[in-house]
Amino acid sequence: MLKKLILGFIILLFCACNDEKIDENILSKGTKTTEQYKQDINNLDLNSYKEIAEFFKDNQNIVFSDKPVLIIFSANNCVYCDKLKHEIQNNKEVQNILKNTYNSYYINTSYHKIHNYDNKKTSTEELSREFNIDATPTLIFFTPKHKTLLIYPGFMSAKRLALTMEILKDEKNQKLNEDELFKTLFLAYKEKNV
């Protein structure tokens, strides 16, 4: 028993005399996370639309103010979402309308995020359920007062998108009932051949 005690003391002495310092970088700091880390996690979805992100507002805070609102729902590995991004990326008119005329938001449903929407915190999944997002892309157009004007599932060309945004920003068109609005859009699409 005495031998074990002496051996333990010798081992403890050698360990205490060791000059190596513990590398604090390999130790966990517990649940403390930096603000940069939190921001990076919240912006993971930005990489999925980085080529057009400058035309959209931060989707964590969806604001209804004096401008109409457009929310585009997309997903990873969605061919038509990529095609829509390409259309936006290559059309200055659409870029200008998205940035200056609308409060525009791009939400990738492949990522979990919390959004401030309708004065409450709502997850991406809850928003998708609220608007019955079954297919991507889906474009949802709102009045500044939060009335849903149009839910458009599927791809929309840049020319049709620009025309749709121009028609839906007009207050007189925002007051039309659903049938009248669809008729107005259909006739405009036909006239402009988009």
Describe every region a protein language model picked out.
Residues 82-99:
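Typically the conserved alpha-helix immediately C-terminal to a functionally engaged Cys/Sec
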Residues 75-80, 88, 110-114, 146-147:
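Solvent-exposed loop/turn segments at secondary-structure junctions
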Residues 49-69:
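A short beta-strand-turn-helix
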Residues 17-53, 151, 162-194:
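Non-globular targeting/processing and membrane-anchoring segments
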Residues 87, 129-175:
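Non-catalytic, surface beta->alpha helical segment in thiol-disulfide oxidoreductase systems
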Residues 64-82, 104:
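Short active-site neighborhood of thiol/selenol oxidoreductases, capturing the structured segment around
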Residues 5-14:
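Sec-dependent N-terminal signal peptides
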Residues 94-122:
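Thiol-based oxidoreductase modules, predominantly thioredoxin-like and allied folds used
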